Curated annotation (Swiss-Prot):
Domain of life of the organism encoding this protein: Eukaryota
Entry's localization field: Vacuole
Record protein name field: Vacuolar protein sorting-associated protein 41
Protein family: Belongs to the VPS41 family.
Ranges for the WD repeats: 114-152, 153-192, 194-234, 240-280, 324-366
Native source species: Saccharomyces cerevisiae (strain ATCC 204508 / S288c)
Misc. comment: Present with 1170 molecules/cell in log phase SD medium.
Function: Required for vacuolar assembly and vacuolar traffic. Acts as component of the HOPS complex that acts during the docking stage of vacuole fusion. HOPS is an effector for the vacuolar Rab GTPase YPT7 and is required for vacuolar SNARE complex assembly. It remains bound to SNARE complexes after vacuole fusion.
Gene coding for it: VPS41
Composition bias type Polar residues, residue spans: 1-30, 41-56
CHCR repeat residue intervals: 753-901
Gene Ontology cellular component list: endosome; fungal-type vacuole membrane; HOPS complex; late endosome
Amino acid sequence: MTTDNHQNDSVLDQQSGERTIDESNSISDENNVDNKREDVNVTSPTKSVSCISQAENGVASRTDESTITGSATDAETGDDDDDDDDDDDEDEDDEDEPPLLKYTRISQLPKNFFQRDSISSCLFGDTFFAFGTHSGILHLTTCAFEPIKTIKCHRSSILCINTDGKYFATGSIDGTVIIGSMDDPQNITQYDFKRPINSVALHSNFQASRMFVSGGMAGDVVLSQRNWLGNRIDIVLNKKKKKKTRKDDLSSDMKGPIMGIYTMGDLILWMDDDGITFCDVPTRSQLLNIPFPSRIFNVQDVRPDLFRPHVHFLESDRVVIGWGSNIWLFKVSFTKDSNSIKSGDSNSQSNNMSHFNPTTNIGSLLSSAASSFRGTPDKKVELECHFTVSMLITGLASFKDDQLLCLGFDIDIEEEATIDEDMKEGKNFSKRPENLLAKGNAPELKIVDLFNGDEIYNDEVIMKNYEKLSINDYHLGKHIDKTTPEYYLISSNDAIRVQELSLKDHFDWFMERKQYYKAWKIGKYVIGSEERFSIGLKFLNSLVTKKDWGTLVDHLNIIFEETLNSLDSNSYDVTQNVLKEWADIIEILITSGNIVEIAPLIPKKPALRKSVYDDVLHYFLANDMINKFHEYITKWDLKLFSVEDFEEELETRIEAASEPTASSKEEGSNITYRTELVHLYLKENKYTKAIPHLLKAKDLRALTIIKIQNLLPQYLDQIVDIILLPYKGEISHISKLSIFEIQTIFNKPIDLLFENRHTISVARIYEIFEHDCPKSFKKILFCYLIKFLDTDDSFMISPYENQLIELYSEYDRQSLLPFLQKHNNYNVESAIEVCSSKLGLYNELIYLWGKIGETKKALSLIIDELKNPQLAIDFVKNWGDSELWEFMINYSLDKPNFTKAILTCSDETSEIYLKVIRGMSDDLQIDNLQDIIKHIVQENSLSLEVRDNILVIINDETKKFANEFLKIRSQGKLFQVDESDIEINDDLNGVL
């Protein structure tokens, strides 16, 4: 197999350099044997595990484990200073809100874990954790930090750890890579690369592929696998190229060290002096290169190898990289599914190894023929965002809601800005890149926004011996236990668990600081309803003690209502206790004079004891706050307060108060008390008690109640008050109102009287109007009586038709004649007398005279009073009396208008015309008499001619029909006789 021409030794047969750990757990190096070679030690867990107790919160911890929360955290164990503890307590008491994170020292590890050696690398996998030390020892533990085994892997510091779940791999400064099995401690293999290894990654299915990727100080990204003969084949994926050094700009064959190698599917990304490089393995094409910024915090020419890059895979296609003070977010566009791998530092995920297929992906790399036919990459890498943070990053992990948790060392931005200004002014400042290692500074944890780097939260963490540590001595890892993520802050000789505060932690934090309301709010999710209520009660009682009535009013109902809603329906005793406490606090507020503020918050359901509601209403009534009194007797159910007591009190106040005018609206007057009393009576359906007050208050609701409840018979003595309810003026002015106004204003009372016609007779109502009502009520009586007209009950007013005629003659003359024509149960003579006494009732008199046969009197009235010839003629025609014609002619001969009207009447016989003409006096002046007579003659001639023609027609038709009749009579008839008829005739003749 051939590789790049510039590196002819990139493919090596390393079989001679590969060392296998035998069953005696010793390492044999055939090429480089150290005189002080150490055997690989596998320590039993029982030898390195100290006594461990289970904490109450479910996290395994030692009895001396310390928990630290706050913004300035001291996580050191052992000799804690009492004064420092007191200061911390005071600082925490000053805080209003709990910290976002809590810190717990991890003490499950062996006692000598940090004492004899210091940690150089970490791995937090899904099923186990691994810790490498500077002496080359690898500690494997469970996710609860219970030791699994300890292995002596290397002769010097372990710089990286990786796993595929079944196998683990470590890389060391000593230039070796150790790969071992988690199941078989004796199955350990060593690979010697002769140069320090900074990063190593196993294939996701290493057991089958035996493939891994590594890189280090040699500057090569090496893919190692076994060929078909079983020999190890190393393939350098990055070409060796000339580079310019920063000192002399001279070309050099030296490549910068590989600081980290990570893979996503069949993509590999690595970090070196050239920055961040993404490479597609099948095509060996570089997809993207992002140079490492040469300036960090005003320090020029910063070497990338001073800082370890830290990579975290957010999703299968998104990766975030933190390096120095820079953070990049990349997105990879995949065209097919593939498993991800990654390797390197403490935040690497164990199961993200590249999904290489040894027979396809790598085959293209091994075949020289295939290498000349490299395809086009089927994926791309995009930089989504890039920003810098004010810290040197030594670890990062995803947090919640598109946030990043970053471990590092803070940089004073103000100081750096000052330096920038001084540099602009020409002042000479020199900072060496090595100073950025921040040795002796305490590390910080920051939560920043993933897309813009905005700082959200900041904590400084004081770890053991931090004064002696630098940036590369810290590690940050993440592990998700079921659903709760945990973060681990590891230094060379200390380990701290970092967790987001749970609801229970928040609850305890608030309780310690007596912030009962906040504890009560969170308690909904962490404690029972009864215990939570006791905390809420503590908060309310504390407000009572402080006399903070405003806050008490604001929170009172919130606590009690939520408590009642959360209680079980069977918790009767607890519910009653809650209601009792609720009532007690409300009564305290009432006593303190905060009734107006607390009244709207007093619950209607569930109901408290009656005394609470009574106290509020008594207060409003005693202080003449009638509007408030009305508001709450309207809002509250009658069962909540002592209704009868308030009814009695209002009755007493009404009796004691002076009777105000109808227009009085002042609170405290008896009309206001009466309104509230009526309201209570009506809510209790005590209508008989409410109506007298409604009548006095002239409240129209009385009409509705009397109508619906059919109570009018009980209040006949107050019929005048009932009728006058809708009327606001003086009684004497009623007579001045028109019938229309009467019907409009008194519509409801009249309807009420009419609807009770079957229970209260018309006679009774008429009697009341005649004897008990003012004379001005006659119009109302008239409107009441005519209400019966055109109804099925019109017979009820038959006895009062004479009275109606008189009322019609006074108030509605236009309707009198139709009434006379339609009804017959009145005394005609009395009606004639009434109509005769009233001027202008001529039509009515004419009708009445005609009704009794006095047609001549009626006709005389028409002629003398109405002077209406046409009406007189129509009157005579309707009666059809010839004598009446004679009377009209004789009575009208001296009246030209009437004479002319009779002569122009075209439907009468000529005899009338002759009588009129003959009876006319010679001096009678009639307009157009000649034309009238001429017209009469023409009409008569025409009539005669028409009659003659009709006679001829009739005679002709008569003759025709007579001749036909005679002809028919003179003709014989033909009869058909059957044989049966002949036989019958013969028999009859024989008999005869």
